Amino acid sequence: MDYIIEDGFHFDIKNGKSPSYLINKYRTGHVIGNVYLLNKYEAFYLYLKNKISIDDEFFNGNIKFYMAYENLIGSGLYVKILNDCFMCRKSRNSRYKKVRFMPDDILLSFKDLYSDDSNIYITVDEEYESVYYSMERIDIKGSRKDDFSAASIDVSSGAYFGMNCPEWFGIDFHGKRLLNDYEIRFLNNDVKSNVDVIYKDLIKRGFIVKSGFKYGSNFRIYKNSMNEHSDYLVNYMDHDLWYVIARAVRLASNVRKRLIISGIIDNDPVYIKIERIKDIKTIL
């Protein structure tokens, strides 16, 4: 039997072991006719474990992609590589699920992320630690039914104050409700950006919507009352680097909140939730 890496390199199996031993124990490679075939990441994994010997400098892959692969294999999963993704399952009898590898510097559009058929991601950070994320398209709903029909704006000394607004709208300023730019544009029905569209839609969906500036987000939202804990931070996304998204998820987690990313698809506001996962097996 020939032992071949997909790039054409030949290797030997150490200690008299057979291909079936490596396939069963390490879940690597497959036999085609009279050839035991490995991809370069499987070969590098076995090489580092001192299970195969190769004379040539054969590995020319992405080291972070390899480290993601090694982490998945080390978690006891069955792993196949498909382009820039891993197909993973917990056992021989379970179904494969796609786990997409996300380089830190990949630029994504919201539409790309929203329409992605993967809902599990793995990235390797600058300290070479593997981190998992889940993505879910969600239809978020609050429980407020606020009435703005009688609301108006009073301009005094260059400041804008809300009149006849819900108690949460604006901030208290000597007994008046001082408005921010989003609130002013909302009452004036003046939409200047997609972020304004998201702001208006969140209120329509029954949320209290407040600034998320101190959390590095566009908004923080409450389902019913500001006396409750704000569960979600909301960011608007058009295009972003993956590391910016991952950082926002981490910051939300650090303040015991979850991150919702919003965007516009076919002129409609839509939402996805992205969270860090400690154990990938819980969602496979």
Swiss-Prot record:
GO terms for biological process: tRNA splicing, via endonucleolytic cleavage and ligation. Gene3D superfamilies: 3.40.1350.10. The active site is at residues 222, 229, 257. GO terms for molecular function: lyase activity; nucleic acid binding; tRNA-intron endonuclease activity. Its EC number is 4.6.1.16. InterPro entries: tRNA_endonuc-like_dom_sf, tRNA_intron_Endo_cat-like_sf, tRNA_intron_Endonuc_cat-like, tRNA_splic, tRNA_splic_arch_long. It catalyses: pretRNA = a 3'-half-tRNA molecule with a 5'-OH end + a 5'-half-tRNA molecule with a 2',3'-cyclic phosphate end + an intron with a 2',3'-cyclic phosphate and a 5'-hydroxyl terminus. It is an enzyme of class 4 (lyase). Pfam families: tRNA_int_endo (PF01974). Keywords: Lyase, tRNA processing. Homodimer. Belongs to the tRNA-intron endonuclease family. Archaeal long subfamily. Endonuclease that removes tRNA introns. Cleaves pre-tRNA at the 5'- and 3'-splice sites to release the intron. The products are an intron and two tRNA half-molecules bearing 2',3' cyclic phosphate and 5'-OH termini. Recognizes a pseudosymmetric substrate in which 2 bulged loops of 3 bases are separated by a stem of 4 bp. This is tRNA-splicing endonuclease. The gene is endA.
